[in-house]
């Protein structure tokens, strides 16, 4: 699962480095020696803590993951999660600025009073590959005689041991007598290779070319496509027809070509991408300025445009629409704090999370994002197996327009682009509540180098409404609250930012919420309003509530279909999966359910 964002060694080292650079040699002593004092606000914010000052009470509140600290200037003790902690050096005020010793972070935040994070005594067999294991796997495959220098890596992940052995570990703490293995998927030009590596014995177990398949779109493919477009005279001539003379202002979006059985004139065995483009007009939102009816087909192996598909020229809509948020004025609201003054009600032990009666394992996959595994529920003392593994199985976003720039669009965001790789760091207090624990995750990039994603997953407990209430006449009121634990992850795929919540309820149910924010994809049209001559034809495939919007732009019909792969160990009814339509595909041999649902 990775490290807690605010407890990482890198953050600690950075904070201490900053602390030393701002050190104030004050006449304050610790254990008989002179203390090195550093600015509190700067040091703790670099470390990742939230610093608040109550001018009325003359007290600091420091919040970081599972630690809730109150400390007064000059006091010899701090209150950490409701428990007193003796300080080696008190907080000192000088020129209306708080100073702490350079040992303050270790003294307070690693005091042991925060019980959120526990040391893992025996690693869980489904723990994601560590950075060192990723490096080891890459070294082993690179040593193979079959490895070619320009080979890239699409996915490096754990090859899990037998399911029965994993359950025996989770339920009975039996050691798994199987070596750790890595599944390495590579891309050699257009050819896919899957290798299996034995990490314990440091050897290559298999090397298997995969036939009749296409590899994922990798991050460096985006740069390659942009470079090809920028240097193409043919493309420059095409955009010049649309009044664009500087191709460096053209932003490309490489898309998979789809499958049309050769009717589109494209070779199915070639590594091709269709490229649609937008104009950067300087408003921060190139999505609002589509270069319509122009599609470049790029061959990634030949590094060139092999075909340009054009329709009638449509003027690029130029009205500024800075929907990236820079023009948004936040409402003037008073601050809201969510605090847990005595610590968390859940613990994180390695990659295992325990909350109330729930226990589950959490890891990150570069393709599907978070993976929830070995889920159990304590049912009156009996630990029941609920789900072996659950994750996003995949998703597709088809657009309902047969025009030249749209008919092929049916994005397989997870399978084609890797939604785990496109994880968006979570902003505390904005994307997740301020009391959330934010976890870093490590995956491999396309070169096989370990890549840490900061604040990749948020874990938090929240109030979920009243559980029960009854007021009997003449008797005391009886009210109880409902709580739930949320695991949140956000992936940004192009213009959309998808937010996924796994929600664990006290009554033994699991919910999955999925939604999208970001910027809508629009089609450029000639009509400026619905009164224009071309409006009816321009909007024949548009959403009925927004046919022509924002002058020369139309919002097309599209759907977002989400599928989650849920490998249950007990078959429970799947209810209320979506507000529109849902269906399930059940696989009895592994008690697995692929649950699909859509959002317009």
Predicted regions, residues:
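Hydrophobic, ordered structural segments
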Residues: 103, 107, 111-117, 187-202, ...
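Short polybasic amphipathic segments
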Residues: 59-62, 75-81, 184, 353, ...
